[in-house]
Amino acid sequence: MVSKQSKQAGRLPKRKEEFTYRGLTIAEMKKLDMNQVAALLPARQRRKIKREFGEEHQKLLNAVKAGETKIKTHLRDMIILPEMVGVTFEIHNGKEWKAVETTPEMVGHYLGEFALTRHSVSHGSAGIGATRGSKYVPLK
């Protein structure tokens, strides 16, 4: 038998916990300066930030701070920082632009991780035209 409490508990909406990165919410991380944010990131990202971003990286950060919501970029090596959360980036994967909306879970990752340059190919049955290597398969 199912009690009334369990029926009511099943109807209650799930409470979504606020995302935290190393114990800090995104709002708290946005208040920190660049060196304090870098201290929270893994070593490779921390090193890149401490050695300063290049001119193109600074332009991208300025565009984000200016309030642009959709930004096209080739900078696949840009680290996603807390102030970039909520911005939609169109990242070039070598062939086309992939639209990626940044979420709090993406902080500390590179933009290029979310616009893959390769994809797996699923071929049809073997035979003429299936792949380049199977062009010369003798017909039965």
From Swiss-Prot:
GO molecular function, a single term: structural constituent of ribosome
One example of a Gene Ontology biological process annotation: ribosomal small subunit assembly
The UniProt record lists the keyword Ligase: no
Keywords for the protein's UniProt record, in alphabetical order: Ribonucleoprotein, Ribosomal protein, RNA-binding, rRNA-binding
Database matches in InterPro entries: Ribosomal_uS19, Ribosomal_uS19_euk/arc, Ribosomal_uS19_SF
Cysteine-cysteine disulfides: none
A single Gene Ontology CC term: cytosolic small ribosomal subunit
Ranges in coiled-coil conformation: none
Taxonomic superkingdom: Archaea
Family: Belongs to the universal ribosomal protein uS19 family.
Cited NCBIfam families: PRK04038.1, uS19_arch
The protein's role, per its UniProt record: Protein S19 forms a complex with S13 that binds strongly to the 16S ribosomal RNA.
This protein's name: Small ribosomal subunit protein uS19
